[in-house]
Regions:
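C-terminal functional modules
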Residues: 1-26, 30
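Conserved beta-strand/loop scaffold segments within soluble protein domains that form the structured core
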Residues: 25-28, 33-294, 304-309
Length: 309
């Protein structure tokens, strides 16, 4: 049964306000709340003893969506979930994931998710993932999420991956890996907000193995209060390829940010670029908004929203 709290979590992490269109699997408190397959997208529970599902998308599937959100409303719940995606050739699909935790007590609630993609040739996949946490009024339970995403990208295929950590995650360790074949392209946009005493680590590896493979990473983060962030993207060129890593961060209060981009070329025809910048909000930007009638707090929030948009 979907409660009012569940519905709010689903809207925040997957923009769902009712029953999803197309294939979906809604996981709630380590169980399946609802599941639906379609003619072209089949979702089945794992049979190897692991928690999780297999998603099989038939070759030639175009214009379809698949929603697989996870919500947790219990305190003290910890789970490790494996979801495997098999995307056929010549597909064009959107996959919407994400996890939301409403911690109802003082114990730690934790979701560790391992997503592995096997994407065929000449396909396009848009994958989005939002993470959000909150505590019930008066409660202090920690919210922890550790996502791992592994993508095997076939020839001439494209994956656009958008990841967002909205708020309320006390600790996260992200592990993202791409293995790109000939003519394939990956674009990763990571947006992260930490506050309080939260900690976030993000390790990313993109191997451009095939000729004319392309990779691009855009990381934007904001660290507030005493929070800590470490971002370590690695781009490896093993053939004639192009890769670009861009990391921009805003630091506030007594926060700590480390941005450690790395590029490695194992081929003379690999073209790899990395950029990293960390700074505070410029005073003239705040002043300009304040002259338009915004309070200092409203001006700051407006700038942060635009930066993370």
């Amino acid at each position: 049964m979907i409660t009012e709290i569940d519905a709010k979590l689903l809207e925040k992490i997957a923009d769902l306000t009712g029953k999803p269109v197309g294939a979906f699997n809604i996981r709630k408190d380590s169980g399946c709340e609802a599941r639906q397959s379609t003619e072209h997208i089949e979702i089945t529970p794992k049979t190897d003893g692991k928690q999780g599902i297999d998603i099989r998308i038939k070759a030639g599937t175009k214009g379809e969506q698949c929603h697989i959100p996870v919500i947790i409303s219990k305190t003290g719940l910890s789970e490790l979930v494996y979801n495997d995606f098999y995307v056929g050739d010549n597909c064009d699909v959107e996959i919407v994931a994400g996890c939301g935790i409403h911690n109802s007590g003082c114990n730690e609630s934790r979701h560790d998710g391992v997503h592995t993609f096997y994407i065929g040739k000449n396909s396009r996949v848009h994958y989005s993932e939002k993470h959000y946490g909150e505590d019930a009024k008066g409660q202090t339970g920690r919210n922890v999420m550790n996502p791992q995403t592994i993508v095997h990208l076939g020839e001439n295929s494209t994956m656009q991956m958008d990841t967002i950590q909205i708020r309320g995650i006390d600790s996260t360790k992200r592990d993202t890996r791409f293995y790109c074949e000939k003519g394939s392209e990956v674009v990763v946009t990571e947006r992260l907000l930490t506050h309080g005493a939260q900690e976030a680590e993000s390790d990313m590896l993109i191997e451009l193995n095939g000729e004319d493979a392309k990779g691009r990473v855009i990381s934007r983060s904001v660290a507030q209060d005493e929070s800590k962030q470490v971002f370590h993207p690695v781009m490896v060129g093993n053939s004639q390829c192009f890769g670009h890593v861009q990391c921009d961060s805003i630091i506030m209060g007594s926060a700590h940010i480390e941005s450690i981009p790395a590029i490695t070329a194992n081929c003379p025809d690999a073209q790899l670029i990395h950029e990293a910048a960390i700074g505070k909000i410029a005073g003239d930007q705040l002043l300009k908004l304040e002259t338009l009638g915004l309070t200092p707090e409203e001006a700051e929030e407006t700038i942060l929203k635009g930066f993370l948009a």
